[in-house]
Each structure stands twice: as C-alpha cells, then as structure tokens.
C-alpha cells in the first residue's frame, strides 16, 4: 500500500508506475483505492463509476478498469456534503457527519472488493487517501491505516520534497501513528526531487538513522507527463501556457464544483492551442473559444459564474464572433432552464440558463453512466468521437434536433447527442472526452477557427508517459527491497 504524508504527494502516480513495472514483469496486477474523493471520474465497461486515477492505473496494469478497484467514491456537492458511490453506483447523499456514521457499511464494500481482487490477481497495489496522520479522521478510517491494519498490508510512505519540509513530513507522520501502524511502514519514497542528489544524502542518512526505516529511493521531478490529474486543477495547469506558436486561444472558467477537467488534457498538450483556466475574480480575456466545463452542482456553479460577472463577458464573446462549447453541466447551462425538483444537487428549484440553445434540463434520480462512441455531426470529414457520459440531467427541446454528435449505441442504433446553434457559434454535448480522439479534436478546433488544425493522439501520449514513469521508478527505486514483503 502506498500512502502519502500529504495530499498530492504523488501516490496516484507512484501506484501507476508500480503497476506498469509489475505488469512488465509478467505479474497479474490490479490497482485499488478503498475510498476516493474526487470530481474526476471514469466509467467502467459495465457502466460503473470510479476515480479517474484508478482507471489510469488500470491502464498502467494493462487490465480493464473495474468498480472493485475503487469501491467507495465520494463526489463533493458542497463544502460539507457529497454523493456516495458504492461499487460504481450512486447510493445516497450525505453530509460529513452522516458519512462518518456510514463508514462501517462502506468498509464492508471495501473489504468485499479487495477480497475479489486478491483472488483474481497476483498483486494488488493499494493507494491511500490524503494522509494517514489526520488525527480527527482516525476513528473508523477506511482509506489509510484503518484499511491496512484490517487486511495486514505493508505500507510505503511517499513524501513530496518539492513543496519543502520533507523530513518533517515523514518523521511527523510516523510520530502521529500508533505503534502497530508505525511498524507497518516498511520504508519511504521521496518524490519530485530537483538538484544534486549528493547534497540530499546527509538528510537521507539522518532519516534512516532516526526512524530505522530505509529510503527506497528518490524520484526526480518529471516534467511533461500526460497523466490524468485526479482532483483540483493544479497551479501548473491553471497558469498561462505561453505557447509561442499557439494559434487558438481557449478559455475555461474554473467553477467551484468543476468535474472531469481531464476533458481538456488534449487541448493542454496541443501545440497549436493556448489553453487558460480563469479563476474567481479574473476577467474573461479575448479568446477564440470558451468552454463551460462539467459540474457536480450545475445551478450553484451557474450562480457563481454570474456572480463573477462572466455572463456579460460570454455574451460579448459571442457578439464578436467567438465560439462556445458546453460539456455536460456546461451543456445544461447553455439551455433555457435547469430544473431540480427533488433537490439532487442542492436546494430544490429551477434556474434560468443562458438560453443560447432551445432546450430545458431536468435532473432525474438515476445517473446516466456509459461509454460512448460515434462521430461529430457536422464535420467536413469523418471525425470519430470516443468518450463517456456521467449525468443526472435529461434535456428536452427543439434545439436538440440539430445535434452536435451522432452516437452508436450497443444495439446498433444511432442516437443524437447535444445541440448546435443555428449560427454555428454554440455547441453542447453530454460526452466527456470529446477532444480525446485525434480526428474529433481536429474537427472541433477547425470549427473553433483554427485553419490547418491538427489532431493530437492523447492516448499515445498517455501510454508513453506511463512507460517513462515506469522506467524512472525502475531506475531510481530499490524495488527488490520494496517488494520483499510480496515474497513472504
């Protein structure tokens, strides 16, 4: 089990790399995260929902993602509440106190999934959540040491040296653990190191002498990895890219409950695109394309967007010939009305959308979860689309008669998705990952005004990044010592 001294210490990345290292060695390996809290999720082949990181780790392990790899997924809908997804299906909505009381039930799901994986695979590489040293969360813990103790799992502790204080993080974390938990930690990985390793060696020697535990290795800071980010849009992603040769400027407003921002990974990596995320209080700069992202709380995020003064800026953007795309929750914002009569995403009621597309959306009790494939409806050449749907909204109206995509269902029938405005400036779709296929990316960029647009093969970039990550772990970690417990 890989645990971290902090959030974003590199647990997900290390687990992905270890999965590929073990898969290369011919092992049947599966990733596992008992409990994940994230708004970035993926859809499994059987129509379940898991954390995006576990889907990436499954790819690294060269296996199909399965709901057992992330049995408990928490999708925050407010600062104090979340949708609880068990074995891939939304079960209930709870506030923090109610979920704490529910944890014994959640642990049953965790243990059942873990048992199935251990029966099916040679090795299960487990990822913790946040830090095991959160004293207030120790009671009924199912994500870190509470799980490790229950299944008798050895733990490797990862710390991020790039943020500073790495030795305090490691020693302090150990000090907060119980004796049995401390004994369970077999050693350390120091992540994201830049500089001369010889200057770090005295600190490593001190750490090993102080704790009696080995440092399995120091991983360098790896620039340019094209791997799915799990949670918040990190600073490097939010900042101006400053691509000198970029020909198309794309803006994405960052909403409080933005979901599946991995939709923009292909644009982030595209050499012809200058992708920028704008946060609260920032003006909408001149752009060719504005994309309204997915949201876990669409009406609340629509209120936030308006409170920031972005609606007049978007109307001005369209008036001067700019293009707008809405994805999932963003699609719902582009219609006339959003209705939530049962209060699935907050207080019951209705909100006026922007009205740029003629349809209304009603939030239903059952979530649509499916992988999809098809093509762009209005492209000058065949443009294949591949992605997934995760939404509770059902949209109806005449605007949907001019679809954005044609999707091929499993039964062989073709169905319409999304909408496109009569003037061709506004496009909406429920499909996440709409930019991921090279021909779809090329077609959408051409529609947005980029003449000579080229597609980008995000899948190939992701696979190359996994290989590079595995090479780095193999060359910088003492894998023999770290995997010793597996041979017992």
Swiss-Prot record:
Belongs to the CobB/CobQ family. CobQ subfamily. The active site is at 328 (nucleophile), 432. Catalyzes amidations at positions B, D, E, and G on adenosylcobyrinic A,C-diamide. NH(2) groups are provided by glutamine, and one molecule of ATP is hydrogenolyzed for each amidation. This is Cobyric acid synthase. NCBIfam families: cobQ, PRK00784.1. PANTHER family: COBYRIC ACID SYNTHASE, DETHIOBIOTIN SYNTHETASE. Pathway: Cofactor biosynthesis; adenosylcobalamin biosynthesis. HAMAP family: CobQ (MF_00028). Residues 247-440 form the GATase cobBQ-type domain. Pfam families: CbiA (PF01656), GATase_3 (PF07685). One of its GO terms (biological process) is cobalamin biosynthetic process. Coiled coil: none annotated.
């Amino acid at each position: 089990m890989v645990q971290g001294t902090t959030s974003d210490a590199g647990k997900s990345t290390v687990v992905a790399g270890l999965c590929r290292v073990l898969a290369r060695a011919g092992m049947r390996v599966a990733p596992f995260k008992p409990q994940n809290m994230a708004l970035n999720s993926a859809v499994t082949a059987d129509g379940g929902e898991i954390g995006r990181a576990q889907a990436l780790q499954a790819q690294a392990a060269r296996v199909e993602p399965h709901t057992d790899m992330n049995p408990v997924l928490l999708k925050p809908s407010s600062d104090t509440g979340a949708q609880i997804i068990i074995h891939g299906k939304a079960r209930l909505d709870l506030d923090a106190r109610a979920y704490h009381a529910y944890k014994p039930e959640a642990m049953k799901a965790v243990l059942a999934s873990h048992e199935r994986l251990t029966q099916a695979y040679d090795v299960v590489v487990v990822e913790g959540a946040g830090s095991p040293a959160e004293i207030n969360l120790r009671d009924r813990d199912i994500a870190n040491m509470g799980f490790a103790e229950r299944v008798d799992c050895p733990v490797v502790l990862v710390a991020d040296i790039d943020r500073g204080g790495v030795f305090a993080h490691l020693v302090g974390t150990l000090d907060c653990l119980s004796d049995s938990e401390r004994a369970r930690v077999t050693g350390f990985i120091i992540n994201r190191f830049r500089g001369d390793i010889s200057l770090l060696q005295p600190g490593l020697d001190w750490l090993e002498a102080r704790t009696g535990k080995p440092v399995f290795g120091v991983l360098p800071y790896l620039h340019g990895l094209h791997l799915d980010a799990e949670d918040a849009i990190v600073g490097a992603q939010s900042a101006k890219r400053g691509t000198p040769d970029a020909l198309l400027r794309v803006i994405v407003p960052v909403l409080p409950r933005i979901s599946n921002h991995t939709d923009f990974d292909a644009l982030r990596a595209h050499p012809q695109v200058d992708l920028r995320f704008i946060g609260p209080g920032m003006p909408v700069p001149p752009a060719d394309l504005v994309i309204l992202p997915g949201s876990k709380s669409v009406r609340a995020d629509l209120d936030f967007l308006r409170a920031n003064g972005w609606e007049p800026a978007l109307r001005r953007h369209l008036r001067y010939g700019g293009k707008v795309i809405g994805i999932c929750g963003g699609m719902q914002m582009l219609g006339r009305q959003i209705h939530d009569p049962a209060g699935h995403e907050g207080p019951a009621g209705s909100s006026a959308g922007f009205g740029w597309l003629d349809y209304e959306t009603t939030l239903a009790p059952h979530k649509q979860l499916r992988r999809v494939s098809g093509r762009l409806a209005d492209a000058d050449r065949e443009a294949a689309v591949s992605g997934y749907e995760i939404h509770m909204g059902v949209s109806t109206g005449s605007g949907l008669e001019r679809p954005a995509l044609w999707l091929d269902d499993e039964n062989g029938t073709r169905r319409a998705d999304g909408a496109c405005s009569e003037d061709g400036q506004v496009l909406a779709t429920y499909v996440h990952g709409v930019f991921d296929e090279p021909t779809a990316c090329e077609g959408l960029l051409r529609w947005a005004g980029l003449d000579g647009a080229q597609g980008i093969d995000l899948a190939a970039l992701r696979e190359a990044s996994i290989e590079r990550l595995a090479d780095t772990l193999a060359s910088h970690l003492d894998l023999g010592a770290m995997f010793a417990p597996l041979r017992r």
